[in-house]
Amino acid sequence: MNIDTLIIAVAGLFAVASSIGVLLTKDNFYAALYMSVTMLFVAAIYAAFNIQPVVVIIALIFVGAVGIVTVAIAATYRAGVSRKVNIFWVVPVIVVFAILALAYASMAVESIEVVNPEVFSAVATDYFFVVAFLFTLVVLMMLSAIKLARRVDL
């Protein structure tokens, strides 16, 4: 397993873990935050394959616009949990997850090849200011959403 495969696999695992966090959390605010983190990891997977337009679209639209609107709405609307999760759903979910994991493990026979192997060093140099700007923009928008929701001064 080469470093490219490892980076993509780790980003995929974190994306799956944070998407499970969206399903398991009972608070809309944290579900929106988990959704934004999930989309950032999906964008990281596309960045590993050197597909920059998709990364920019995911970062700007999904994380930026949709994530901030969802965070703002979820932070202002705090309702009680209307549904309970039945414990009997745990076993079928684990069985389906095990079947999917086994199918994926049996079909993954080769390493993932990246078209441009210098992509990871290029992201650090060529797109540093773009990534820093997008990260700063997302943090500022989330802070303003929290400020509006809680009506406090930061």
Curated annotation (Swiss-Prot):
It is found in: Cell membrane. Its main location: membrane. Keywords: Cell membrane, Membrane, Transmembrane, Transmembrane helix. The keyword Transmembrane applies. It is a multi-pass membrane protein. GO terms for cellular component: plasma membrane. The keyword tRNA-binding does not apply. The chain crosses the membrane at residues 5-24, 29-48, 53-75, 87-109, 124-146. This is Uncharacterized protein AF_1823. It comes from Archaeoglobus fulgidus (strain ATCC 49558 / DSM 4304 / JCM 9628 / NBRC 100126 / VC-16).
